[in-house]
Amino acid sequence: MMQQLLADGVKWVDLRLAFIFFYYAEGKEEPEANYERMFKVFGEEIEKFKASEEGKDFWGARMIWTGIRVLDTRKIVEDMDACIGIKLAYPHLISGYDLVGQEDGGRPLKDLLPELFWFKKQCAEEGIDIPFFFHAGECLGDGSDTDQNLFDAVLLGTRRIGHGFSLYKHPLLIDMVKDKKILVESCPISNEVLRLCASVMSHPLPALLARGVSCSLCNDDPAILGQDTAGMTHDFWQALQGWDNLGLAGLGSLAENSVRWAAFEDQNAAKWVHDIKEATLGNGVRAEKMKQWSVEWEQFCLWVVTEFGDDGESIRKLGKETSLDAQD
């Protein structure tokens, strides 16, 4: 997976994984009692790849622990408890917590408030902070429980919103998202496949961008939805082809946002927002990675101009000549 990501230009990944499977250690016929061994291997493989010649440019990966929203209270609490246990054992590998599954077929966030408050209380007692990165608003409704997940996600302090498809319908909420520096993780191909929109042309992301909402592109279950690779090329290509106002500069802004809002390290809410506001002017890991990205972006733009500049000039000249001929 890391090989595929790096080959596609992705240097950092915040993975989401639902822990509803048994993990078997190599050569063992009985599953592990918990996921500690899996995370041990996960961390070792990341460092092994980064130390290799092939992976020397890879920044790393962390995991957003993902629960299933349709489960009952006991199972969700047990899953949350397992998340806390792994965070205590491998704090550098767990970056946040989310609840996934079909939103309108599962429990809304307002129904899960007791479990979420219990989770936060347990984290505080253990002296750890596991922020929320909620899926919310992945729906067509307006005022439904699923749509209102957006409001609850913001009130619960989510740092990013997965999908946020229905956000464009709520001007006041848009202003809150902007004020709180919350990123919207948009997944165009997923939204098409799941029939939230007929094509990328009718996707609401351009409306959010026009209102100044910070957004990024994400792939959302590529192995299930048909991309069949871990990279981002398919979603970026869809966006480039579908939205004329976006262009190369717009794609660059979306990519930069994915670096700006990445969960590189544990930070409290105030430090998280401060570093996002500071961007490249800061002095932490986020600023360092954004500076690296900016250098590579400038190099990429230079390559585009060098490789295709003459062709572009020829096309512009041809367009002017055609226009003059038409006037004559």
Regions found by a protein language model. Give the residues of each.
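Acidic, glycine-rich loop-and-beta core segments that form the ion-binding/anion-interacting portion
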Residues: 84-85, 89-156
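Glycine-enriched alpha-helix->loop->beta-strand junction motifs that scaffold or abut catalytic
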Residues: 94, 152-160, 178-185, 212-214
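Mid-to-C-terminal alpha-helical segments outside catalytic/metal-binding sites
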Residues: 244-328
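Conserved, mostly hydrophobic/aromatic
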Residues: 9, 97, 135, 153, ...
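Short acidic/histidine-rich active-site segments
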Residues: 99, 131-141, 163, 211-231
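Histidine/acidic-residue-rich catalytic or RNA/ligand-binding cores of hydrolases
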Residues: 109-111, 140-154, 171-178, 194-205, ...
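Catalytic beta/alpha-barrel core
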Residues: 68, 98-101, 159-169, 193
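Alpha-helical scaffold segments that flank or form the walls of functional sites
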Residues: 1-16, 22-24, 40-47
